[in-house]
């Protein structure tokens, strides 16, 4: 039995009602430290992680998404060429839940250089990728079996550049977020200090307005509240989280609040990365790279504004991504520069994080994706 087969077998033996399958996206540098997407299991009683195993070889699968059926995983390829064509790619994989192994299904070229993020609409009909260096977003229809069809639309993002150089040197779309009602797509552009809104017509992106952020903010990622009334945007460059009210009819955004993710008086270098809402809707979490920390906020039950609870060390260097378990009891953070995952216990009443000391080595870890146990 070769090493990969042995590790798959070991991963399968750890599967129980008290374990949770997690996939980790990575950068795959030329030195071969990482080879693609890794699978690991979280013991939901102790917080311990199993030894990571390579689930599928892939070129810089730096962001992952899950089909609503829990059986198909989508990954972007943050590369300059795919299948002999310039630009990144979008791939789909069949999940083998017992072992964590991923079987490649298809791969489509995006035509955009350096893809940074992908989003799947709630109805599982369309996949949209943001090309950070290509300055565009591209949409792909999804077939009934979850496979990705060829691209059907590409929208360039244009407008005046933000004031923060050199980062705001051109358009830099950084994320794709669908409204919970499946009506709109929101794209954060770090280079333009704007949030672009689109509608979908048979998977074709149709421009539907833009919304300005604070100059130099550098909007990166966003998350909706479950009811769709609030959109939370983490701004990479000025290390803040902005709260927007979202009109239920028009989808228009109105700025309500901006809060810092850093301690008062901190003067070191840092920039934000990921933002998540707790499954119970009461807390918001954001990561700081440089300060290497996780900021925890309470959501006001009526107006959705945020108040800082705590800022805790991320357990490594450059926390580019993290995710909460579906039951909200655990948070797993991917620290890219220290090549590790760190597990935190989440208090569902206060939102506070407790470092468990449980960690696992994953080279260039940059994305964390939980697969619900009932998938």
Q: Where on the chain are the PLM-derived regions?
A:
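Short loop/turn segments immediately following beta-strands, especially the blade-tip
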Residues: 40-47, 93-100, 139-150, 198-204, ...
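An edge-strand/N-cap motif at the start of beta-rich repeat modules
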Residues: 18-43
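Short, solvent-exposed loop/turn segments at conserved positions within beta-propeller repeat blades
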Residues: 30-35, 82-88, 132-135, 169, ...
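A short beta-strand motif characteristic of beta-propeller blades
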Residues: 50-56, 103-108, 161-166, 206-212, ...
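Blade-level signature of beta-propeller repeat domains, shared across WD40, Kelch, NHL, RCC1
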Residues: 336-375
